[in-house]
């Protein structure tokens, strides 16, 4: 992990499935990342506006707002936050739209741990992974 100025970057997880949040949070934390998890995308956007996290991992299919809508709003409230998509549905149109809007990675659930961690590292360092 590449820390910025000795500070561990925050990775935010946004997913409406608590079990996915728990497992993904555990994976990231065990690799040394600081993790904040959100079931509610609105609460996440409020947090992001105030805290400017380095990376946001967004599910696509969620109630209230889908991941692409969250990504669009995030560009307004925290434009420096990099987005990684983590979804259960491999939809080429969604992948294309997310990447065109600036996502640095797109991963399918269940995720390959090593590939996902490499994608988070790339996002935190400002590069694209997939």
Model-inferred region functions:
Residues 69, 90-105:
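Alpha4 helix (beta4-alpha4-beta5 surface) of REC/receiver domains from two-component response regulators
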């Amino acid at each position: 992990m590449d820390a910025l100025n000795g500070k561990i970057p925050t990775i935010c997880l946004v997913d409406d499935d608590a079990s996915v949040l728990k497992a993904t949070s555990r994976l990231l934390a065990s690799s040394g990342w600081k993790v904040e998890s959100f079931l509610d995308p609105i609460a996440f956007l409020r947090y992001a506006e105030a805290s400017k996290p380095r990376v946001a991992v967004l599910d696509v299919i969620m109630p209230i707002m889908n991941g692409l809508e969250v990504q669009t709003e995030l560009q307004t409230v925290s434009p420096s936050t990099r987005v990684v998509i983590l979804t259960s549905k491999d939809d080429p149109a969604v992948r294309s739209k997310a990447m065109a809007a600036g996502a640095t990675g797109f991963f399918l659930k269940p995720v390959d741990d090593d590939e996902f961690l490499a994608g988070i590292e790339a996002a935190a360092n400002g590069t694209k992974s997939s």
